[in-house]
């Protein structure tokens, strides 16, 4: 929804990030390198993914788009809205069932790069989302789902770039001290 609100102001390939996440310097360099070579009609978009265990919070569950990658491109992405530590194990709950993850899975942290061509899919995704959730008070249009639709609809590809960096962000109030320490260490 936020991307669509900004559509009229976007006149070149663009990146999307979450405001409360730290992605690391290299991730931005990677994305800049990809976007610098795109034109407005390119159908090759990009994302920077992270290793799941580098994106977890000790304070509670997180939501992550777990990625399947093939030949350097996103093949699919499944949003897991409840991933958490249970002791030393990484657990996800999908469709009411607990499943252990390795922690080595590639996940989306919503660092995407798109050409303006992506808006065609975003509009279709949004229209379907609104039509199917018109009475829901809790439904959320998720960027990973909209990005995945580009791939599943055959409207483009999403080049997958990996980041070995440790993500940090403000998922829970308890994360504040860790974030302060991480930022101070980078200054």
Please report, for each region that a protein language model flagged, where it lies by residue.
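Residue-level signal for inorganic ion chemistry
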Residues: 6, 20, 51, 115, ...
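Short phosphate-binding loop-to-helix
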Residues: 1-13
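Active-site phosphate/pyrophosphate- and oxyanion-stabilizing loops and adjacent acidic/basic residues
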Residues: 4, 29, 148
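Short coil/turn segments at beta-strand junctions that form active-site/ligand-binding loops
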Residues: 12-13, 43-44, 156
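Short beta-strand-to-loop acidic/aromatic patch adjacent to the donor-nucleotide binding site
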Residues: 12-22
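Conserved core of the sugar-phosphate nucleotidyltransferase
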Residues: 25-112, 116
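Conserved alpha/beta core of the MobA/IspD/sugar-nucleotide pyrophosphorylase nucleotidyltransferase superfamily
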Residues: 70, 77, 84-187
């Amino acid at each position: 929804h936020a991307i669509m609100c900004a559509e009229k102001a976007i006149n070149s390939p663009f990146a999307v990030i979450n405001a409360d996440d730290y992605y690391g310097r290299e991730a931005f360099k990677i994305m800049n390198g990809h976007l610098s070579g795109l034109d407005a009609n390119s159908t090759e978009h990009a994302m920077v993914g992270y290793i799941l265990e580098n994106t977890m919070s000790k304070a509670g569950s997180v939501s992550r788009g777990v990625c399947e990658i093939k030949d350097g491109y996103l093949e699919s992405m499944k949003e897991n809205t409840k991933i958490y530590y249970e002791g030393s194990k990484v657990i996800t709950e999908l469709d009411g069932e607990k499943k252990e993850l390795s922690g080595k899975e590639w996940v989306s942290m919503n660092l995407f790069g798109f050409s303006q061509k992506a808006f065609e899919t975003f509009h279709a995704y949004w229209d379907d989302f609104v039509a199917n959730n018109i009475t829901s008070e809790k439904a959320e249009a998720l960027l990973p789902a909209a990005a995945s639709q580009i791939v599943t609809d055959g409207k483009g590809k999403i080049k997958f770039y990996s980041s070995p960096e440790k993500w940090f962000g403000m998922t829970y109030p308890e994360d504040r001290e860790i974030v302060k320490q991480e930022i101070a260490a980078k200054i």
